[in-house]
């Protein structure tokens, strides 16, 4: 049970120094030059002599490839690359705004301003126009509201789905126009 703390090698965790349990490793020196296949102890001694760590780079290779480097700096660089990749990917969210056929002008302007902000941030907006009671017999008011929203947003948006009736509400989806 003494070897319970052996770290398994997935892409997120690189083994270093005494965590490496294979007898022979292919070593790359701190200058990037291929040193060759050495025993684990020889490779560790070489790394300690330079005051650096022995880090397992490719555990699936035969024998595993290890590099003599500063492990802290290596982890920092990996974290930096991961953060850059994460920054470049933007998750598109769907924001939802609810209207009524009789929404007052002030409320309408606030919702329109919020909708523009969501679209500028790159999010899609789902517009719900909810009908209550006898309003269902006046669906043209909902269509007029949808047309008004479309006109007020102008050419900044793409209408992904035209207004359609789903139960007691009219639904419409808009997305920001791609800037070229």
Curated annotation (Swiss-Prot):
Superkingdom of source: Bacteria
Keyword Ribosomal protein applies: no
Keywords per UniProt: Cytoplasm, Initiation factor, Protein biosynthesis
Molecular function (Gene Ontology), one example: ribosome binding
Predominant cellular place of this UniProt entry's protein: cytoplasm
PROSITE patterns, per database record: IF3
A GO cellular-component term linked to this record: membrane
Subcellular localization(s) per the UniProt record: Cytoplasm
InterPro entries per UniProt: T_IF-3_C_sf, T_IF-3_N_sf, Translation_initiation_fac3_CS, Translation_initiation_fac_3, Translation_initiation_fac_3_C, Translation_initiation_fac_3_N
GO BP: any one term: ribosome disassembly
HAMAP family per the UniProt record, alphabetical: IF_3
Record-stated family: Belongs to the IF-3 family.
NCBIfam families: infC (TIGR00168)
Function according to Swiss-Prot or TrEMBL: IF-3 binds to the 30S ribosomal subunit and shifts the equilibrium between 70S ribosomes and their 50S and 30S subunits in favor of the free subunits, thus enhancing the availability of 30S subunits on which protein synthesis initiation begins.
Subunit structure: Monomer.
Protein known as: Translation initiation factor IF-3
Species of origin: Xylella fastidiosa (strain 9a5c)
């Amino acid at each position: 049970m003494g070897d319970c703390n052996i770290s398994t090698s997935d892409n997120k965790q690189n083994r270093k120094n005494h965590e490496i349990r294979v007898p022979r490793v292919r070593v790359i020196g701190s200058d990037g030059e291929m040193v060759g296949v050495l025993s684990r102890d020889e490779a560790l001694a070489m790394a300690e002599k330079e005051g650096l760590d022995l880090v397992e780079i490719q555990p699936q290779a035969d024998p595993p490839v290890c590099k003599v480097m500063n492990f802290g700096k290596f982890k920092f660089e990996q974290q930096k690359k991961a953060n850059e990749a994460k920054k470049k990917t933007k998750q598109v969210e769907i924001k939802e705004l609810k209207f009524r056929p009789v929404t007052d002008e002030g409320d309408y302007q606030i919702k329109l301003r919020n909708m523009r902000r969501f679209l500028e941030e790159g999010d899609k907006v789902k517009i719900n126009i909810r009908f209550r009671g006898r309003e269902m017999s006046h669906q043209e008011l909902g269509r007029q509201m949808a047309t008004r929203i479309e006109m007020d947003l102008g050419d900044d948006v793409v209408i992904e789905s035209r207004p359609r009736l789903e139960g007691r509400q009219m639904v419409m989806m808009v997305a920001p126009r791609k800037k070229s």
